[in-house]
């Protein structure tokens, strides 16, 4: 349980972290979520710089997605989702919560689709090496 909490705190530093972690776990298997906690310039807390690769870009896009949700609080909004025929389906009647879910869904799919770009040298990346971030 402690590991789950640590991963949730490190993963993106905001949002319904447990739900995002669960999505990544369900999509990619045990241990996948902890790979991204401190990855590159944008995974973990903050939006530190230009993405180092496509995997890091997934985190950058996720943070930008959250920033666009001006009438929502992605840091606390819990949402509902399900798995249908192997796909994540965001549900519920609240449009804000559904948008938070869609941001997390897109990130999960992005990680899956860019697994081949994951580079262990960026797993725990020193953020001072990051270049100025791209605007959202």
UniProtKB/Swiss-Prot annotation:
It is found in: Secreted. The keyword Disulfide bond applies. GO terms for molecular function: calcium ion binding; calcium-dependent phospholipase A2 activity; phospholipid binding. Its main location: secreted. InterPro entries: PLipase_A2 (IPR001211), PLipase_A2_Asp_AS (IPR033112), PLipase_A2_dom (IPR016090), PLipase_A2_dom_sf (IPR036444), PLipase_A2_His_AS (IPR033113). It comes from the Eukaryota. Transmembrane segments: none annotated. Keywords: Disulfide bond, Hydrolase, Lipid degradation, Lipid metabolism, Secreted, Signal. SMART domains: PA2c (SM00085). Disulfide bonds join 41-130, 43-59, 58-110, 64-136, 65-103, 72-96, 90-101. It catalyses: a 1,2-diacyl-sn-glycero-3-phosphocholine + H2O = a 1-acyl-sn-glycero-3-phosphocholine + a fatty acid + H(+). Its EC number is 3.1.1.4. GO terms for biological process: arachidonate secretion; lipid catabolic process; phospholipid metabolic process. This is Basic phospholipase A2 Tgc-K49. It comes from Trimeresurus gracilis (Kikuchi habu).
């Amino acid at each position: 349980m402690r590991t789950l909490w640590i991963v949730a705190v490190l993963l993106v530093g905001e949002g319904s972290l447990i739900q995002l972690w669960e999505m990544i776990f369900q999509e990619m298997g045990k241990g996948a979520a902890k790979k991204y906690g401190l990855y590159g310039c944008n995974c973990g807390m903050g939006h530190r710089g230009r993405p180092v690769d496509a995997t890091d870009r997934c985190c950058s896009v996720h943070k930008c997605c959250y920033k666009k949700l001006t009438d929502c609080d992605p840091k606390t909004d819990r949402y509902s989702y399900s798995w249908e025929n192997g796909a994540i389906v965001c549900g519920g009647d609240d449009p804000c919560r559904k948008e938070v879910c869609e941001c997390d869904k897109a990130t999960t799919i992005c990680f899956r689709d860019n697994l081949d770009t994951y580079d262990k040298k960026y797993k725990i990346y020193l953020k001072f090496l990051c270049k100025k971030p791209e605007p959202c």
